[in-house]
């Protein structure tokens, strides 16, 4: 780990490797799937190239097409930077080379338009700035006025012919749909570099910080899931809340590659409940009865928060091995008791002579030692009977645990929905790292599916799909299903469905697979 660094030094090769490999979740301006993709495609190795990358992945640039190649300006830049001989660097006029050389002949910035106007048409700084404003504000009437001045200026300067001047200005005018402010782009690139630096050299702290700020995002549960999956791919596990680690925020294990989930980020557990929990001393050795009588009842943990905490395993620990389903069942039974009856059980638990190991026994002691009026007695006896003879199976199952954790934590941490189906031979984590096998079988949950129509091939217009899937080892984001396969199995290829995928590795991209067959689990 680097403890000292120069704020103006942008030459850390490990940081650039991280960006170029598309490991950019949490990296400023590059954390979207679009950012990851183009970071790999463009492969920037310095701040100037990173500034261009950030500018080029804006919607306008991606939509703008080069008239000659019909490629987007973003793709054209990437091809030219990579030295693709099918897309050589070209300039409308030789005088543009010094201005556009650093962006491989692609007009990326508003400042480039200003320089062109100054050098070719003799614009002063104010006139060039008027051009920049017209580009930024997309004012057609102002652009027309400046065009006349530009063409006239080139003729007076004798730099290019009138036809070339009109062509160049037309090019500048089209750039108004996407050209970005370079000073902003460089500032963004510097921020992106330093966030990537933190991810490279302060990995655990990076994830802890970003996870604790996930609630600032519009869809915090999606942000949490993406960060946790990204952390897994980097070798860092995130554990759900537990009795030994009941804390408000995400916290690090200083000795292991572990981060513990913060209660504040559990859906249904508010800040007030967290503040109550923080007042507790060591509860790591509490039993389930202790949790009821020493935590939930005395702290007045509200019902919604208690159910959420039970459902994600927050009350599980060294001396509480009860299933979550059983704890939820018994908590529901506890809530059927009156406040007076609950308080009586709490008091009984303080005395060795009346202390019980189970809630069923505690209710029995309540019936024997406490005066209960006739109207309540039937209810209390029914509660005791239901505790002794539950109405349904109280064992935990992978599907139910994973479903509840996904709902309340943002993703499943203890297990996956497919853990009960011991049929897969491969895991997402290994495949994402580039496992080379002829045949791959994955038992997965489908996180997302994007259906598109083919443009080329024998039968253009057919549907194909791109999936993001996961199992308990991690996430696999690059899963491709071609038209013929998608048409056959589309009925099981649904978001949140659990399926078996039979695949082969893609020859084009490491960590990517092509699906040949899908089967419902």
Located regions from the model:
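Noncatalytic, beta-rich nucleic-acid-contacting surfaces in large DNA/RNA-processing enzymes
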Residues: 1-521
């Amino acid at each position: 780990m680097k403890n000292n660094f120069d704020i103006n030094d942008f030459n850390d090769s490990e940081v650039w490797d991280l960006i170029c490999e598309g490991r950019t979740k949490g990296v400023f301006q590059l954390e979207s799937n679009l950012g990851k993709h183009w970071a790999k495609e463009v492969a920037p190795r310095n701040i100037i190239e990173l500034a261009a990358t950030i500018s080029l992945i804006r919607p306008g640039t991606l939509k703008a097409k080069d008239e000659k190649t019909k490629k987007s300006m973003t793709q054209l830049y990437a091809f030219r930077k990579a030295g693709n001989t099918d897309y050589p660097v070209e300039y409308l006029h030789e005088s543009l080379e010094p201005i556009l050389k650093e962006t491989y002949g692609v007009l990326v910035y508003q400042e480039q338009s200003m320089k062109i106007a100054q050098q070719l048409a003799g614009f002063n700084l104010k006139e060039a700035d008027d051009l920049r404003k017209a580009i930024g504000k997309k004012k057609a009437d102002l652009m027309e006025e400046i065009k006349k001045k530009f063409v006239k200026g080139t003729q007076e300067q004798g730099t290019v012919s009138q036809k070339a001047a009109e062509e160049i200005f037309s090019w500048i005018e089209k750039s108004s749909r996407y050209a970005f402010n370079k000073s902003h782009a460089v500032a963004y690139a510097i921020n992106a570099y330093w966030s990537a630096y933190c991810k490279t050299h302060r990995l655990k702290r990076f994830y802890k910080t970003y996870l604790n700020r996930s609630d600032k995002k519009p869809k915090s549960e999606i942000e949490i899931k993406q960060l946790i999956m990204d952390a897994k791919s980097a070798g860092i596990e995130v554990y759900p809340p537990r009795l030994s680690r009941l804390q408000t925020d995400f916290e690090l294990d200083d000795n292991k590659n572990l981060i513990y989930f913060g209660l504040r980020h559990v859906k249904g557990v508010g800040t007030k409940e967290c503040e109550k929990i923080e007042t507790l001393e060591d509860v790591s050795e509490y039993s389930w009865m202790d949790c009821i009588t020493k935590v939930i009842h005395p702290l007045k943990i509200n019902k919604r928060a208690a159910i959420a905490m039970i459902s994600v395993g927050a009350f599980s620990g060294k001396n509480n091995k009860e299933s979550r389903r059983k704890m939820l069942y018994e908590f529901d039974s506890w809530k059927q008791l009156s406040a007076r009856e609950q308080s009586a059980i709490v008091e009984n638990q303080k005395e060795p002579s009346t202390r019980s190991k189970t809630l069923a026994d505690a209710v029995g002691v309540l019936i024997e030692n406490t005066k209960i009026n006739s109207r309540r007695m039937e209810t209390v006896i029914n509660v005791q009977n239901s505790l002794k003879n539950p109405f349904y199976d109280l064992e935990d199952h992978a599907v139910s645990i994973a479903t509840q954790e996904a709902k309340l934590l943002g993703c499943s941490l203890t297990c996956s929905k497919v853990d009960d189906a011991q049929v897969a031979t491969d895991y997402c984590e290994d495949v994402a790292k580039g496992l080379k096998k002829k045949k791959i079988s994955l038992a997965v949950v489908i996180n997302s599916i994007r259906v598109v129509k083919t443009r080329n091939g024998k039968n253009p217009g057919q549907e194909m799909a791109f999936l993001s899937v996961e199992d308990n080892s991690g996430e696999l984001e690059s899963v491709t299903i071609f038209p013929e396969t998608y048409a056959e199995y589309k009925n099981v290829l649904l978001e949140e469905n659990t399926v078996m995928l039979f695949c082969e590795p893609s020859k084009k991209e490491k960590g990517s697979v092509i699906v040949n067959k899908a089967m419902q689990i």
